[in-house]
Regions:
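N-terminal signal peptide c-region/cleavage motif recognized by signal peptidases
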Residues: 18-21
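Solvent-exposed adhesion/ligand-recognition segments of exported proteins
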Residues: 105, 128-135
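Solvent-exposed strand-loop boundary residues in beta-sheet-rich modules
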Residues: 115, 127-129, 178
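Predominantly extracellular/luminal cell-surface or secreted proteins
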Residues: 96-98, 122-126
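Bacterial N-terminal signal peptides that target proteins for export
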Residues: 1-11
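Contiguous segments within soluble domain cores/interaction surfaces
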Residues: 117-121
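N-terminal small/polar-rich segments of proteins
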Residues: 23-109, 113, 137-178
């Protein structure tokens, strides 16, 4: 009898071990997540690194005998130029050369009619036209807090004798550093 009890006990012990071996096992670990953000800016609501539209300076329509014509650089929405950069950056706008700089006395820049006529003009950082924005002039903005900043750029064209009617244009390069 004792042998029978031992065999039954041994069998039960074996079953217990077998069922323990088949029981689910839990292991633990972790997933590492990451995201790398780089500083960026938007100009008038658009991002990118080349070909951005910094706005348009429209002097309007005047007769060919005008003395001065004033305008302001307007962004895409009709307001002033808008710069939105990552928090912690200090953006600066560099207004580079135009296509016709120095081609007409009376201004550092010039609008061209595509034939042989130029209208001189200059850019300014104030509406009163007292703070000249020279070629390669830099406008440094406040440190960004993630809120769009307004950049005001004004222009004043100067009339001169002998200008024929027509459309006069110029293209100015602009750089945004942040």
């Amino acid at each position: 009898m004792r042998t029978l009890v031992s065999r039954i006990g041994l069998s039960l012990f074996g079953l217990t071990l077998a069922s323990s071996a088949m029981a689910a096992t839990t292991v633990t670990g972790q997933i590492t997540s990451s995201l790398t953000l780089i500083s960026s800016c938007q100009v008038n609501g658009s991002g990118g690194s080349t070909g951005l539209n910094f706005g348009a300076l429209n002097f309007g329509t005047a007769n060919s005998l005008f003395t001065t014509a004033n305008g302001q650089v307007l962004g895409g929405g009709g307001g002033a130029l808008s710069i939105l950069c990552s928090s912690g950056t200090t953006p600066s706008v560099k207004v580079r050369a135009g296509a016709n700089d120095g081609k007409s006395p009376g201004g550092s820049r010039a609008l061209y009619d595509g034939v042989a006529n130029y209208v001189p003009y200059d850019l300014y950082t104030d509406a009163g036209h007292s703070q000249l924005l020279a070629i390669d002039g830099v406008i440094t903005l406040a440190a960004s807090t993630g809120v769009a900043q307004t950049v005001n750029i004004y222009g004043q064209a100067v009339g001169k004798a002998g200008l024929p009617a027509g459309t006069y244009t110029d293209t100015i390069a602009v750089e945004l550093t942040f």
